[in-house]
């Protein structure tokens, strides 16, 4: 065999070069991720706002009809079709999330985020140019592809970049952008829809995201993801001897399985390992139930508020309420978890308690006849309901080994949507079409939060271990074998 890539060790050890202070500090990097997340969820609020979503044509007993407004009015959608439109992004998210999670082991994760955000931007522009239900529904599906690249990879970056004592608070800042973004979307969509037309809300979103598309291809994260090799750097040859294959070895390489098949096999092993984690299963089951209600609230909240209490400017009221309560609740929940020692058992205690109390306040709020009593009780309920936003994702990140975190986040995202807010929006619409009573429909959907609290309560009594610092030699060997196969196949 011919040995290549060997270098003699230097006779004299050179002094390390002076390190320059990087402009992109962990704090600035996390700020960029938070803004991207905010814009993403502004889009969720925009599509649900009365100014953009609008209302269908209404006819009175005399047959006199008033013209519809927004998307629903222009495309003449039923409540069920309208609910489907809110969930269409999930098709892209479902397909693309596991793909991006798998590709993160072979390609630079942050560049993958850039690819996804490019798709997101183009799809949002397409929403503005749509002229019927099916066209805008297809573009909403591609919006989900863009979100898939970001949602499964951003949280592990934050988990690695944050100081140990403030991990949950930094995650809280990131997940605070969910309620804040949706709420800003209500306000932004209502204002732009009423003044410039619903299509312009999408165009402005795309312009805002385009800046971060460019950044994602130009900047390098301040820290490499734990459990992953640096895909942009070449492997050092100082400590490892590289051996050129003999003719016999080369002939064996030709019979190796192709790169794509190796990736599929490795992905299958990762998926099996993930779903063998009982803590992950219980956490996600509670998250699915929780998100079923949150999805219905986020899409139908302004319309329910108008239908029950005849609120003027329901978009503004729900938007403002959700911004304030979402920020307080999300940051409050993450701060409390950091203070009480963020073990997995303590996290489940916080999840169960805050959801149970939040459900009680929200249920009582919708029983109130007085609008101001409703707002006061619902505000307290929202603060408590938003408290789990960071802790539930902390469990997803810390109940698995580091190299499984993107897949854990991707799988969690897929499941909470496909079994949570995706069916809840159209089912709520179908229930309202049948009951024709906004109060009853909302009370029924709110009661499901009690089930989420019970499921998370089970997690308190499980034998849970924080695995975020585990390094599996078996995994490293498997990935080295995979890389060796794919690299050597080019030599054969």
Curated annotation (Swiss-Prot):
Protein's recorded name: Probable sphingolipid transporter spinster homolog 1
Region (Disordered): 472-492
UniProt key word Transmembrane helix: yes
Glycan-linked positions: 53, 76, 341, 488
Topology within the bilayer: Multi-pass membrane protein
CDD domains noted in UniProt: MFS_spinster_like
Function: Probable sphingolipid transporter that plays a central role in endosomes and/or lysosomes storage.
Gene Ontology MF terms: transmembrane transporter activity
Keywords from the named record: Endosome, Glycoprotein, Lipid transport, Lysosome, Membrane, Phosphoprotein, Transmembrane, Transmembrane helix, Transport
Organism domain of life: Eukaryota
Cellular component, GO, one term: late endosome membrane
Chain ranges passing through the membrane: 29-49, 83-103, 119-139, 141-161, 169-189, 200-220, 279-299, 317-337, 348-368, 372-392, 407-427, 442-462
Similarity remark: Belongs to the major facilitator superfamily. Spinster (TC 2.A.1.49) family.
Coiled coil, from the record: none
BP terms from Gene Ontology: lipid transport
Keyword Iron included in the entry's annotation: no
InterPro entries in the record: MFS, MFS_dom, MFS_spinster-like, MFS_trans_sf
Localization in the cell: Late endosome membrane; Lysosome membrane
Positions carrying Phosphoserine: 472
Organism placement in taxonomy: Eukaryota, Viridiplantae, Streptophyta, Embryophyta, Tracheophyta
Biased composition (Acidic residues): 472-481
């Amino acid at each position: 065999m011919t040995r290549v890539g060997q270098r003699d060790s230097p006779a004299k050890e050179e002094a390390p070069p002076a390190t320059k202070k990087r402009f992109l500090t962990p704090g600035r990097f996390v700020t960029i991720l938070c803004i991207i997340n905010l814009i993403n969820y502004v889009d969720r609020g925009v599509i649900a706002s009365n100014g953009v979503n609008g209302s269908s044509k209404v006819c009175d007993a005399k047959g006199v009809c008033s013209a519809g407004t927004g998307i629903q009015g222009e495309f003449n959608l039923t409540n069920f079709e309208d609910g489907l439109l809110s969930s269409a992004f999930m098709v892209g998210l479902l397909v693309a999330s596991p793909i991006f999670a798998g590709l993160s082991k072979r390609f630079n994760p942050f560049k993958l985020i850039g690819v996804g955000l490019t798709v997101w931007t183009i799809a949002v522009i397409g929403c503005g140019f749509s002229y019927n239900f099916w066209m805008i529904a297809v573009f909403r599906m591609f919006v989900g592809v863009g979100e898939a690249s970001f949602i499964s990879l951003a949280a592990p970056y934050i988990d690695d970049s944050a100081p140990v004592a403030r991990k949950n608070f930094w995650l809280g800042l990131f997940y605070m952008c969910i309620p804040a973004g949706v709420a800003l979307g209500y306000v932004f969509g209502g204002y732009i829809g009423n003044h410039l037309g619903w299509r312009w809300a999408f165009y402005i979103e795309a312009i805002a995201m385009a800046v971060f598309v460019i950044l994602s291809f130009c900047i390098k994260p301040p820290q490499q993801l734990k459990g992953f090799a640096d895909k942009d750097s070449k492997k050092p040859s100082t400590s490892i001897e590289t051996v050129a294959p003999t003719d016999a070895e080369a002939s064996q390489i030709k019979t190796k399985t192709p790169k794509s098949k190796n990736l599929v096999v490795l992905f299958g092993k990762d998926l099996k390992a993930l779903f063998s984690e009982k803590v992950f299963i219980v956490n996600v089951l509670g998250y699915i139930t929780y998100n079923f209600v949150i999805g219905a609230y986020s899409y139908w909240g302004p319309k329910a508020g108008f239908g029950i209490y005849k609120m003027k400017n329901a978009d503004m009221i729900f938007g403002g309420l959700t911004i304030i309560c979402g920020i307080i609740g999300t940051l409050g929940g993450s701060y409390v978890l950091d203070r009480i020692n963020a073990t997995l058992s303590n996290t489940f205690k916080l999840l169960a308690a805050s959801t149970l109390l939040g459900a009680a306040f929200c249920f009582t709020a919708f029983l109130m006849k007085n609008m101001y009593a409703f707002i006061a009780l619902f505000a307290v309920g929202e603060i408590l309901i938003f408290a789990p936003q960071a802790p539930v994702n902390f469990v997803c990140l810390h109940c698995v080994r580091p190299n499984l975190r993107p897949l854990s986040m991707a799988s969690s995202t897929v499941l909470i949507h496909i079994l949570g807010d995706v069916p809840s929006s159209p089912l709520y619409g179908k229930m309202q079409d049948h009951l024709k009573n906004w109060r009853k429909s909302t009370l029924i959907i709110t009661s499901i939060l009690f089930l989420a609290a019970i499921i998370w309560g089970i997690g308190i009594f499980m034998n849970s271990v924080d695995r975020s610092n585990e390094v599996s030699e078996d995994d490293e060997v498997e990935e080295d074998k995979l890389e060796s196969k794919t690299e050597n196949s080019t030599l054969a």
